[in-house]
Amino acid sequence: MYGLINIGFGNVISGDRVIAIVNPESAPLKRLKDEAKDEGKLIDATYGRKTRAILITDSNHIILSAIQPETIAQRFKQSMIEIEENLNKVR
């Protein structure tokens, strides 16, 4: 019910498919990123910039973003608010 979420540089994802937004600094997440690359499930949306957030989807795809996790989370929240406002207008 989140719709499309901007993850930076004109890239958008389906908010309903995201199950986690995490900071990429830990070793387990670096391994997860490497495994996804080997399996062909890594999507790099950083445009060569530093990875600041890793988004994990329900299909086990790993999406790299150059936007901070907090910023992406705020965009999810804003998207939900906009959807609720539109639903209230219809009711």
Curated annotation (Swiss-Prot):
InterPro entries, per database record: RemA-like
Superkingdom, natural source = Bacteria
- Pfam family for this entry, one: RemA-like
NCBIfam families, from UniProt? Answer: PRK04323.1
Q: Which family does it belong to?
A: Belongs to the RemA family.
Name this protein carries in UniProt: Putative regulatory protein Tlet_1629
Q: What is the scientific name of the source organism?
A: Pseudothermotoga lettingae (strain ATCC BAA-301 / DSM 14385 / NBRC 107922 / TMO)
